[in-house]
From Swiss-Prot:
Keywords: Cytoplasm, Proteasome. This is Proteasome subunit alpha. The formation of the proteasomal ATPase PAN-20S proteasome complex, via the docking of the C-termini of PAN into the intersubunit pockets in the alpha-rings, triggers opening of the gate for substrate entry. Interconversion between the open-gate and close-gate conformations leads to a dynamic regulation of the 20S proteasome proteolysis activity. Belongs to the peptidase T1A family. Component of the proteasome core, a large protease complex with broad specificity involved in protein degradation. Its main location: cytoplasm. NCBIfam families: arc_protsome_A, PRK03996.1. SMART domains: Proteasome_A_N. The lineage of its organism: Archaea, Methanobacteriati, Methanobacteriota, Stenosarchaea group, Methanomicrobia. One of its GO terms (molecular function) is threonine-type endopeptidase activity. It is found in: Cytoplasm.
Length: 249
């Protein structure tokens, strides 16, 4: 009988615990922590998104797993957490971008679209009969000739970063970024840094077939995903680097 009050605030999204916590939101964050590792890095000449898709079966077609999405011409998003929840939020972001284009005849701002997604997420933390989104998004793009990178949390919180990560390998990736990130690095250097961080987070268990890379450059302000040959080239550089380090040891 003593457990009944606890079960109430543990299960209900609208009920705070005595110490001010919303457990369902915290559980949604745990879903993100169990997800694939996604990385975002701002460079001097653009912004980069990378995801290790973590394919667990050789029977799965790698191309069928998508973790980096185009939101608008100048905006991309990387996801971690529940795949279906992420797809729903990506679809909503695309609609918001198109509505802004039709209504105002201009591209939506990266911060604006990020806030709209966070506002939507936040509503799912305060109404009965719903659950929080079990996914986080890294939203990257170019605003006013500046690279922008935002993280959206399941609670609806929004933070802008120079470099960050979401998913299972977040701690390992952030440790690399804190040691090696530089604001003056270019897109190529940012991609290599992101891959190096993913390599360490995955303990060396990755290859070009499991990686997705998206970039938005200041030069053309267009989002694009790197092709397999481009990804393979960067992966080769990382593997050669670590092979050389092992030989030195």
């Amino acid at each position: 009988m003593q457990m009944a009050p606890q079960m109430g605030y543990d299960r209900a999204i609208t009920v705070f615990s005595p110490d001010g916590r919303l457990f369902q939101v915290e559980y949604a964050r745990e879903a993100v922590k169990r997800g694939t590792t996604a990385v975002g890095i701002k460079a001097a000449d653009g912004v980069v998104l990378l995801v290790d898709k973590r394919i667990t079966s050789r029977l799965v077609e790698a191309e069928s797993i998508e973790k980096i999405f185009q939101i608008d011409d100048h905006i991309g998003a990387a996801t971690s957490g529940l795949v279906a929840d992420a797809r729903s939020l990506v679809d909503r972001a695309r609609v918001e971008a198109q509505v802004n284009r039709v209504s105002y005849d201009e591209l939506i701002g990266v911060e604006v679209i990020s806030k709209k997604i966070c506002d939507h997420k936040q509503t799912y933390t305060q109404y009965g009969g719903v659950r929080p989104y079990g996914t986080a998004l890294l939203i990257a793009g170019v605003d006013d000739n500046k690279p922008r990178l935002f993280e959206t949390d399941p609670s609806g919180a929004l933070l802008e970063y120079k470099a960050t990560a979401i998913g299972a390998g977040r701690n390992a990736v952030v440790e690399v970024f804190e040691a090696d990130y530089r604001e003056d690095m270019n897109i190529d250097a940012a991609i290599l840094l992101g891959m190096d961080a993913l390599y360490k987070a995955a303990e060396g268990k990755f290859d070009a077939g499991t990686l997705e890379v998206g970039v938005v450059s200041l030069e053309d302000k267009k989002f694009r995903k790197l092709g397999p040959e481009e990804v393979e080239n960067y992966v080769h550089q990382i593997l050669e680097k670590h092979k050389g380090n092992e030989n030195k040891e």
